[in-house]
Amino acid sequence: EIENIWNGLKPPYVDLIKWLKNQGKYPKVEISETFHTMMLANSINLKKDAVKINPNDYLAEYKWDGIRIQISCKNNNTKIFSRTGEDISHSFPEILINSKKLLVLDGELLAGKDFTPFPFGILQKRLNKKSPSKKLLISNPVFVRLYDILFYNELDIRDLSIIERKKFLEKFFLSISENKYFDLSKIIKFSDFKVLNNIYLNCSESNFIEGLMLKKKNSCYIAGRKK
């Protein structure tokens, strides 16, 4: 509960302390300023676990070698959070969204140009830079490969299936004009797990792919790691 409001609170955290002591109500914060706990994955062994699941119930995507981020925007104010909820907006000033209504996106921040990834080391040079120079922005460009969407035009869609959320994500993506920084994660088509395993084995580090993600088609967006 604290994680969900932390970024919207300011020192000396009077309301938070009162709530923790049961002396006040749960603090209210501007939702666009807050971090929403991300949905995390569990590792599986395709050979071992494939017999337990129906491939028709799942979609697959590549897991890229970047950093997982959440982007929140309202009233044209863009916030970028790391997987742990740290506000890293200042390190990536070029990643902006123009939206009056609340949008919350989930994706992978990658170093790269024209949506072609660069080595992770190039991205590392951008991390923890509070005021990156124009030279650094040019020499170490970045973009976001979008996986999911949590809020669309103020609407909380986390309870919808991933299939339905992907439709909203595509709608957002198509609404962006002159887009240089946002790309959609590719859906991998597969007929069975043998095919998917072959795709996995062909994942190349030279293409900056860490592996594959399986997502159940009817799954809603659940915070944390569900077992």
Residue ranges and their predicted role:
Residues E1-D192:
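N-terminal nucleic-acid-engaging modules of covalent nucleotidyltransferase systems
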Residues E94-I95, A223-K227:
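Short, intrinsically disordered, charge-balanced linker/junction segments flanking boundaries
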Residues L127-S133, N198-Y200, K226-K227:
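Glycine-rich, charged/polar anion/phosphate-binding loops
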